[in-house]
Regions:
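Absolute protein N-terminus
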Residues: 1, 22-24
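Intrinsically disordered/low-complexity terminal segments and short unstructured peptides
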Residues: 3-4, 19, 55
Length: 211
């Protein structure tokens, strides 16, 4: 009998908790336009958040580092981010928690202006990222180092904005290259902006215990 009453009490508690949480609105940050970043919108449109009693507002804020700033300020309840911005913020005293991981690889592609035909031509060029400290910034610098280009001494890194803005900056010759997720790599191929080297050579694991 006691076990039955405990079970009933637990079910009542869960029901009340769900009703209470249904009245709560959460603000979710979204930092990029990419295939994996669409999960927040899918969750909202398919009613997955509502299923668990959450009313969700998805807010697009370009750049992971900018998302972190808004998150730390308390104006977001959670955000979909890559690893670099949150880790950097925690090293500076923030108390952010990552509770799920979508990717264990850096899946950016390097997109350059069509006239760049070799890795050697990357030296001395201008490259665009979303914001300093973002995953795009981390990925851009990591890729340059991977091919022997010092991102500090042999390249210029500029804050441009989100991926559509960076592709536009390549078209207008304001920058020479950038990193981008799908589907922007496919778009760049149609525009005759090369991916150098082939995308598969750029895919490497983040340094995490699960990788």
């Amino acid at each position: 009998m006691k076990k039955t009453m405990r079970l009933i009490a637990l079910l009542v508690f869960l029901a009340v908790s769900r009703q209470t949480s249904a009245q709560e609105k959460i603000r979710v940050g979204q930092g990029s336009i990419s295939l994996q970043s669409g999960l927040m919108y899918i969750g909202k449109d398919r009613g997955l958040f509502a299923k668990y009693g959450l009313t969700t507002e998805v807010i697009y804020i370009p750049g992971g580092s900018t998302n972190v700033q808004v998150l730390v300020s308390g104006n977001l309840d959670l955000s979909q981010l890559s690893g670099a911005p949150g880790v950097a913020a925690n090293l500076e005293g923030a108390d952010l928690i990552y509770f799920v991981g979508l990717l264990d690889k850096l899946n950016y592609q390097l997109i350059t202006r069509p006239e760049i035909k070799s890795i050697e031509q990357l030296k001395g060029k201008k490259f665009g990222v979303s914001r300093f400290g973002s995953s795009a910034d981390f990925g851009m610098r990591a890729m340059l180092k991977l091919v022997g280009v010092d991102p500090v001494k042999e390249a210029t890194i500029l804050q441009i904005g989100d991926e559509p803005a960076r592709i536009a900056a390549i078209k207008s010759a304001n920058i020479d290259g950038t990193v981008a997720n799908a589907p922007f790599g496919t778009e760049a191929e149609r525009l005759n902006s090369i991916l150098s080297p082939t995308p598969s050579k750029w895919i490497f694991h983040f340094s995490t215990p699960d990788c």
